[in-house]
C-alpha cells in the first residue's frame, strides 16, 4: 500500500473518489435529493479546491497495487481531526483503513499532538466498531446536515 498527498492537479480524481466512496457508504440510507445536494455543495470542484488549498487541511490517497482504493482528509489547527476517511467497498477488510489510520496517528504524534478526533454517523456501525477497535472513545456528538436531513454524528477521540 502506498499513501500520497493529494495535489491540486489531482482535483478531479479527488472528486471522483469522494463521490464514489460517499455513495457506496451512504446512498442506501439517504434520498437521492439529499445525496445530490451534498455532492453539489460539499464535493464540488470549487469546494474541494478551497479545501485542498487551505493551510490547515491536507488530503491523502491510498493505493493498493497502484489502484486508488480510498482517501483521507486531515484538519490540523488547535486539534488534529480526521474529517474524512473513506475506502472503496472492494478494498475494505484488507487493512487499507488501518494503514490510513496509522498514518494519521504518526502524523499527529510528529506534530506534537497527544490525541486526535473524528466524527462518525451514529448508524455507521461498521466504522464505529473499527474506530473502537483502534482505541477511540466516544466523547460527544454534533449535528451533520446531509441535504435536508439533520443527522447525528458521534465524536470519538484517541489519546496517545
Predicted regions and their residues:
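Conserved phosphate-binding and hydrolysis motifs of nucleotide-dependent enzymes
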Residues: 66, 70, 95-97, 135
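C-terminal "cap" of GNAT-fold acetyltransferases
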Residues: 80, 114-128, 132-134, 141-160
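Acetyl-CoA-dependent GNAT
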Residues: 5-11, 15-90, 101-103, 107, ...
